[in-house]
């Protein structure tokens, strides 16, 4: 065929790669179903060009001296994978698979694992598309003839079943180089998350511009990955909010919304919602968000918040608070050691932290030096609880009155309620005594014994009234 170079639209050459690229470029224009004659001529031109290239000195074809040309199905498959516009389209893959219907059973058996090998060696492969070919050729059901390593095949089929990290169709409008770079980034992202999560923060810390495809599965994964690393991704704040609104029963949705709002640095406008979330969905994750927000915006609340979290966790099987000395849990001490080095923590907060961490030793800064601090009443009650002392009515009444103050913040209200519960629980436990043994009736002579009884009755009335006020607040 003397006009093979004209059909391939290239100059005469002995470079097989140039001939093959020219053939692959023209192949989509001559489909065997829509233009069988054109496809036949193109195929003949390709084979003739290969013969000439492999033996340019000979004008007569001698087939025994040349390699057998690759099957047109394999060439069509390579062309599909190389197509910038069709490689991720299921419809294009369906058209390719229809070509297999023209092959005999013997040809299908020969092509089955060759096609699988080509797919396995393709860097950017849509599993949504290749699963169509896997089902048609029964890669999972048919016995491997040994052409492919069994473990590699099993791993490949598992990856197909798992699916891509996102739908590659969403980036087909981008330049090919950007498509490939985006796929590489997110595939590596998913690999690190599943195999080496400790490297996640380091990987995300790399400064680079990355496309975020419009894919809900990817968006949710990104929210999970970034939140796990305590990193912000402001581009997905709107999606996180819409996720919570569309799936109100999904407990993950509000967490990722509030997590991103915290890590993006939202301040006072978030506090009320965050406190409500902490009450409605108690968890260590919610605790971490509250602590992170405090450390960013109201660091002096941090020690009190740590104590509040500890008190909420220490309950019995009936959910009733246990009597304990604050600061003994390892988690509490860890959080307090973290905040001790924070320069923004006031002397008042630092003194309470040192008191909790170094029991039996006097803190370097006296708690009484900051009586003008707005949180002084709360810290005073917290100090008494840390020292295992019964809070006095004089120390409790100021924080009770703060609950009705117009300028108190939601976090302050949470802390006050928890301090009052601890104080009430402390009072109840203190009044529990062993069963008394029979004793001779004391003689009421108006002396110190009578005065002691009067004092006991007085304190019982005081604390009974205080407990009544607390119950009224929570009723």
Swiss-Prot record:
UniProt keyword annotations, A-Z: Chaperone
Domain of life, source organism: Bacteria
Domain J: 3-70
Keyword Chaperone applies: yes
Transmembrane residue ranges: none
UniProt name for this protein: Uncharacterized J domain-containing protein DjlB
Organism, scientific name: Escherichia coli (strain K12)
């Amino acid at each position: 065929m003397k006009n093979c170079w004209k059909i391939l639209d290239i100059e005469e050459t002995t470079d097989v790669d140039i001939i093959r690229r020219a053939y692959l470029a023209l192949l989509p224009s001559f489909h065997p179903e829509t233009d069988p004659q054109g496809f036949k001529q193109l195929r003949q031109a390709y084979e003739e060009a290969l013969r000439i290239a492999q033996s340019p000195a000979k004008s007569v074809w001698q087939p025994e001296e040349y390699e057998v040309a690759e099957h047109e199905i394999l060439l069509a498959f390579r062309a599909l994978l190389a197509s910038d516009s069709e490689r991720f389209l299921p419809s294009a893959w369906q058209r390719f698979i229809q070509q297999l219907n023209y092959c005999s059973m013997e040809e299908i058996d020969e092509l089955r694992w060759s096609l699988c090998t080509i797919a396995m060696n393709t860097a950017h492969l849509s599993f949504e598309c290749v699963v169509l070919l896997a089902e048609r050729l029964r890669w999972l059901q048919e016995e491997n003839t040994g052409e492919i390593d069994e473990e590699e095949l099993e791993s490949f089929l598992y990856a197909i079943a798992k699916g891509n990290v996102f739908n590659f169709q969403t980036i087909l409008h981008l330049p090919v180089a950007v498509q490939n770079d985006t796929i590489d980034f997110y595939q590596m992202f998913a690999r690190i998350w599943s195999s080496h999560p400790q490297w996640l923060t380091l990987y995300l810390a790399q400064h680079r511009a990355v496309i975020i495809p419009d894919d809900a599965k990817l968006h949710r994964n990104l929210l999970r990955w970034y939140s796990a690393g305590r990193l912000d991704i402001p581009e997905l704040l709107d999606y996180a909010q819409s996720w919570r609104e569309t799936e109100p029963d999904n407990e993950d949705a509000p967490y990722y919304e509030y997590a991103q709002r915290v890590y993006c640095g939202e301040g006072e406008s978030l506090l009320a919602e965050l406190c409500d979330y902490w009450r409605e969905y108690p968890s260590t994750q919610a605790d971490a968000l509250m602590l992170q927000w405090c450390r960013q915006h109201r660091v002096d609340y941090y020690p009190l918040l740590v104590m509040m979290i500890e008190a909420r966790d220490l309950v019995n099987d009936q959910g009733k608070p246990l009597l304990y000395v604050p600061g003994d849990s390892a988690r509490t001490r860890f959080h307090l050691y973290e905040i001790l080095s924070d320069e923004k923590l006031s002397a008042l907060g630092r003194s309470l932290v040192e008191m909790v961490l170094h029991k039996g030793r006097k803190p370097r800064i006296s708690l009484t030096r900051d009586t003008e601090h707005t949180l002084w009443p709360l810290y005073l009650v917290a100090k008494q609880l840390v020292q295992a002392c019964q809070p006095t009515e004089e120390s409790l009444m100021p924080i009770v009155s703060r609950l009705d103050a117009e300028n108190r913040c939601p976090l302050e209200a949470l802390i006050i309620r928890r301090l009052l519960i601890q104080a009430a629980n402390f009072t109840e436990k203190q009044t529990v005594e062993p069963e008394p043994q029979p004793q001779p009736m004391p003689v009421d002579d108006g002396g110190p014994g009578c005065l002691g009884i009067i004092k006991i009755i007085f304190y019982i009335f005081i604390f009974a009234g205080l407990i009544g006020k607390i119950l009224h607040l929570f009723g």
